[in-house]
Amino acid sequence: MASRKENAKSANRVLRISQLDALELNKALEQLVWSQFTQCFHGFKPGLLARFEPEVKACLWVFLWRFTIYSKNATVGQSVLNIKYKNDFSPNLRYQPPSKNQKIWYAVCTIGGRWLEERCYDLFRNHHLASFGKVKQCVNFVIGLLKLGGLINFLIFLQRGKFATLTERLLGIHSVFCKPQNICEVGFEYMNRELLWHGFAEFLIFLLPLINVQKLKAKLSSWCIPLTGAPNSDNTLATSGKECALCGEWPTMPHTIGCEHIFCYFCAKSSFLFDVYFTCPKCGTEVHSLQPLKSGIEMSEVNAL
């Protein structure tokens, strides 16, 4: 029987990382709520909330506490991770939620403690009497003891995995799963697939800049268009001058590279700057010099176009 109880406890034991993640989620939610709340007062007088900031924060945290721990026995972070609080003082092995007094004292220790810490500094700053100085020293001493106790509790939590905060230990509440957790088999198929695709993507990112796109495009166009031989007549230049050998459009600022084909200035210049070994995609002639076209085209041909 004892071994079964121990196995049941170990199966329902919440991981340390899950409890710490729940605390971080709670802090993130508080920051989000406060930032959204302050956005509502941007049009008001500057510093309106600064005077009553501790009280406003306390009211917001009480509102969150009312609809999380008080009603659902779990914080927002715990609800996301399928965790809730259990009364550790209960002798019953079944789940026993925290009592009403434990919930109220949880709010007093967390919300009231933070409010008192923020307000007492303002109180001591505005009063410089000797009696207030002694009270301030006592408060600082108590705060130091609480921080030391929190550190010791955290070290014990790392060792035993129970009571993530000092408040939980003092009130006797700890985190348990909402539903019994089954032992899951870890599969690495998805991870292996992701690693494979990430490796392939990194390989493409490394390889693509090394590919000369302009040269590849010219090579493909030379394969698709049959190579032309030497010019058979004097009219070859005029006939080929109706379209750019690269873009296939009417040549803008027509230039030649030393063969009978005509190019737009931008097409030829950009291709030559991108690849110093640029050749004509139609006849394979290497670039000797980029010269403007000097031969004229009959106006009848222009009108026919």
From Swiss-Prot:
Residues the record lists as binding Zn(2+) 2: 259, 261, 280, 283
Name listed for the protein in its UniProt record: Peroxisome biogenesis factor 2
One BP annotation, GO: protein import into peroxisome matrix, substrate release
Function, as annotated: E3 ubiquitin-protein ligase component of a retrotranslocation channel required for peroxisome organization by mediating export of the PEX5 receptor from peroxisomes to the cytosol, thereby promoting PEX5 recycling. The retrotranslocation channel is composed of PEX2, PEX10 and PEX12; each subunit contributing transmembrane segments that coassemble into an open channel that specifically allows the passage of PEX5 through the peroxisomal membrane. PEX2 also regulates peroxisome organization by acting as a E3 ubiquitin-protein ligase.
Domain notes from UniProt: The three subunits of the retrotranslocation channel (PEX2, PEX10 and PEX12) coassemble in the membrane into a channel with an open 10 Angstrom pore. The RING-type zinc-fingers that catalyze PEX5 receptor ubiquitination are positioned above the pore on the cytosolic side of the complex.
Record's bilayer topology term: Multi-pass membrane protein
Residues the entry annotates as binding Zn(2+) 1: 244, 247, 264, 267
Organism: Homo sapiens (Human)
Taxonomic classification: Eukaryota, Metazoa, Chordata, Craniata, Vertebrata
